[in-house]
C-alpha cells in the first residue's frame, strides 16, 4: 500500500495537477457552470408541469385551460434550449479572463462565431406530406441547445485564441486617450473579431461543399456520438469515478478535473432524457448515465459517498477525534459537501481509508446502473436537481416523481455503510489507542497515518 501511495504522489499527482491547471479545461468547466442556474430554473417548471398527483392534469386544465402545460413549459425552452449559446459566451469569457484580455468582447465574438457556424434551417413537414423539408430562416433549436454544446465549446476556444493572439501582437485600432474606455475596447475588438468571423465563414463555406455540410454535423460524427457512447456506458462511468476518487485521494479536486472533460457529455445526455420526458413523462428514457446519475445516486454525501461514514463516526466512534469530526461533518454531508471528512479524518493519502473511498463509488455505479437499466428504478428524467439537494428528496425529484429513485438512494447509503464500516472500525481503534496513550491529543481529527 505504501508503494501505491508513492506511485500516486510521484506519477498521478504531477499529471493531475497539470490537468487541473489547464486553462482551456477550466474555461469549459466554468462556462458550463454559467448555464446551471438557467437549467435549474427551467427544471422547476418541469417539476410543476409533471407532478405525479392523481387528477392533477384535469384540475390544472379546468383552472388554466386545455393548453396549460404548453404555456407552463415556455420557460423550459428559454433555459434548456439556449444552453449552447450560454456556454459559447461563458467559455470564451472565462478563457479571455485567464489571458487578461477583454472578456466581454471575447464572449460576444464567440457567440457570433457560433451563430455563423450554425445553419438557420429548421425541419418542417407540410400538412398531408410524408417527407420533411428544411425551411431557411428559422432558429435551429436543436443546435443552440444541448446538441450544439461541442461546437459551442470548440469555437469558443478557437475564437478566443485567435482574438487574444491578435490583441497580444497589438494588431488593433487605437483611439485617442480621451475616448471613453468602453468605446475604446469595442474598437480594439474590431480587427480580432473580423478575423475570427472570416475564418469561421470560410470554414463554413468549405464544409458546405462536403458531405458533412456544417460544423455541427462533422462534430457530431467525429466527437459527439463516440464520446456519448463512451460517456453513457457503464464502463465509461466506472472509469470516470475511478479517476475522480484517485484524484481526490491525492488531495486534488477529482470531480472538477474529470468533470471538465466529461461534464459536457453527461449534460448532453441529461438533456436528451429531458426532451423525451417533456414529451411523455411515461416514455422510456434513453440514458441511464447523466450528470444527475453521479451527483444524486453515486456521490451521496460527496465524492466517495461519505454520508454513511459521517453518521458512523457520529454514532459509533470510540475515538473523541472521530466522534467530534462526525458531528462537524454531518450537516455539510447532508448537502453532499464532504471536505471536512476528506481532509479532516483524513482520507487523503490515507492507505487504509483510500480503499473504501475508491471501492464504494464503483460498487454504487454498478448497482445503480443495473437497477435503472433493468427498469427496477426510474432513470433520471433530465430535471436539473441541484447536487446539494439531500437524498430521498433529490431522488424523487430527479426521476420525475418516482419513489424508486429515493429507494435506490437509501439502498446505496446502506451499501456504502457496509463497505466503509470495517475500515472505519480499524481506523477508530487506532485513533482511540493513540488518545489513550497520549491524553493531550486534541479533540480535532488527527492527521497521523498509523499504517
Swiss-Prot record:
Any one GO cellular component localisation term in the record: plasma membrane
GO MF term set: protein-N(PI)-phosphohistidine-sugar phosphotransferase activity
UniProt-listed InterPro entries: PTS_EIIC, PTS_EIIC_3, PTS_IIC_cello, PTS_Sugar-EIIC/EIIB
Nucleus in keyword set: no
Cysteine disulfide links: none
PROSITE patterns: PTS_EIIC_TYPE_3
Any GO BP annotation: carbohydrate derivative transport
Compartments where located: Cell membrane
PANTHER family: LICHENAN PERMEASE IIC COMPONENT (PTHR33989:SF11), PTHR33989
Function: The phosphoenolpyruvate-dependent sugar phosphotransferase system (sugar PTS), a major carbohydrate active transport system, catalyzes the phosphorylation of incoming sugar substrates concomitantly with their translocation across the cell membrane. The enzyme II CelABD PTS system is involved in cellobiose transport.
Comment field on protein domains: The EIIC type-3 domain forms the PTS system translocation channel and contains the specific substrate-binding site.
Protein name as it appears in the record: PTS system cellobiose-specific EIIC component
